[in-house]
Amino acid sequence: MQICETLKADGVTPFVLGDGLSWDAPHWYGALWQKFVPEDVLEGQDFNVKTVTIDDPGYVNGLNYFTDLLDKGYFNDNINSMEHNMALEVFYAGEGAMAYVEMLEFNDINKGLDGDFGFFAMPTIEDDEAKGNQEKLYGAPEGMIVNPNSENVDVAVDFVKFLTSVESQQKVVSEAGHTSCTIGAHTENTIPQLIDGMAYVQNFNGMSNWTDCGFEASIVDTMCKLGQDFAAQSITAEDYVAGLQETAKVVREQNAE
């Protein structure tokens, strides 16, 4: 917060955010929920379609933390009218100090900022109400799943092994400019920020899945739709969570045994 105040005092917007596609702001909310909601509740109870309730106080507390950042002027204006790529262009132009991005975007950001950037994970939140696992990273590796009921499962598995081999993934990094989860895919030609990022990931204490992947799909739809209303401050944190709870109730009933 002190750094944000210093930036703001110098006329620099601390955070750039564009939620025009409705998923960027929920990534912020999810990261804060991971810090505020107990791990067994978020990942154990609420990622399960049979038990999801979304009624832990940490959901509202996490959203109120975001509102506090908004009220202090730490974000750009017109969050909902900018898409993610537009927000990054604003970031590249020096009109914001920080942007919340995925590691897979590092190569693009390297081009946009001519290699002059650093990174850090979402910091620990020192608040008595922050009852989540502060040691985990919020996010997930990208991957592929083979349907066990499909035809030619063995062939599909062999193909996935080929795609995820070190040799194939080195091409993904060097030719496509993408990030790879395969150890050994990043070579001396990889940008240093990405090498440092992958080293960080290999030594983390676990990952908490994106809420737009962990929650059931209809809950995610509600999360994204109401998320824009919340970012615009046209609804309260309590209103937002109540909407999620209504959808969660339907999901539980649909999956009741």
Region roles according to the model:
Residues 202-257:
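Conserved C-terminal helix/tail region of periplasmic/extracytoplasmic solute-binding proteins
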Residues 72, 111-176:
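Extracytoplasmic/periplasmic substrate-recognition and gating elements
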